[in-house]
């Protein structure tokens, strides 16, 4: 065997193709920040399988977009609380910073519009799926928030309605764009 990065990548590619054609899988997980895996992700998706990508923020956009879902590994790291270890805190974006992120705001607004009922309300769960379908690397943790609901609240550009579920302590969250006020009472 030849040693080195390219030899390792080639061996991984051969293994992936063997698995793709030899066994029935529901999806693949590719952990890399290397754009060399972009064609592999595209080929796997052509076969109708889901591709989950994991990599660092430096991952090239082409590879991120080739995946159905892409998660930056930085958001997966837990704060290390062991003695003598200092782990930098993840940045939590302020309301002002979030509102200025036009890509983020438009992504969520468009997802709300596409998922909304006649009064403009959309289930947060459906909005989340819609956002993920539009942007493979979307994750509220990229902005310092654990959940989409926390991020939406922090942006402060959406009305939020928590609706009780029958015979359950749980509730469903619905949101709508604040800009979209109708003259009808909702």
Predicted regions located by residue number:
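Terminal and domain-boundary accessory regions
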Residues: 1-186
């Amino acid at each position: 065997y030849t040693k080195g990065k390219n030899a390792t990548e080639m061996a991984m590619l051969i293994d992936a193709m063997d698995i793709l054609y030899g066994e029935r899988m529901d999806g693949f997980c590719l952990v890399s920040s290397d754009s060399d895996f972009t064609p592999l992700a595209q080929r796997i998706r052509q076969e109708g399988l889901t591709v989950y990508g994991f990599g660092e923020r430096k991952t090239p956009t082409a590879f991120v977009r080739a995946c159905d879902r892409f998660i930056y590994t930085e958001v997966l790291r837990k704060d290390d609380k062991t003695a003598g270890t200092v782990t930098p805190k993840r940045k939590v974006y302020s309301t002002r910073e979030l509102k200025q992120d036009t890509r983020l705001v438009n992504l969520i607004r468009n997802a709300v519009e596409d998922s909304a009922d006649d009064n403009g309300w959309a289930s947060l769960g459906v909005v989340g799926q819609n956002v993920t379908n539009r942007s493979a690397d979307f994750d509220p943790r990229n902005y310092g928030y654990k959940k989409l609901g926390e991020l939406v609240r922090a942006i402060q550009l959406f009305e939020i309605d928590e609706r009780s579920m029958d015979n359950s302590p749980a509730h469903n969250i619905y949101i709508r764009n604040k800009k979209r006020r109708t003259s009808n009472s909702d």
